[in-house]
Amino acid sequence: VNETASKNAEEFGFHKGDIVQEWLWDDDVSESTREKIMDLTDQDLVDEDYDSAVDGVIIWWRDGDDEDALADTIMDAHGVIGEDGPLWILTPKPGRPGAPASNTVQSAAKTAGMNAATPLTVSEDWNGIRLRAFGKGR
């Protein structure tokens, strides 16, 4: 497991004991990022069918998935986390298969009433973009 994934798992804002819900998992996701989040929280990731409150959410998003569907997914995910719980969209890096257009996540976030931060590298092939509700600062 690489050092970038380890460092960035902490930057996600997750803590030991946090329940992190994972949306839209597929076999192309970064397993090192998933493992580091699980190591950091000392919990398994739960899927979108988990029916209790969670402390944070990661959403794996790829080009070809509908932007309106992303906005709906963001709103659904935001509904299961606490007011300040971390919410991340993970996308393939530019130039990688499935990389969305640069404004796709920002547009969907705005539609969902959220601000999108600058992407950060979470693994060799994936970037992460943290979303926050409008008016919640940095």
Give residue spans per PLM region.
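S-adenosyl-L-methionine-dependent methyltransferase catalytic core, i.e., the SAM/SAH-binding region
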Residues: V1-R138
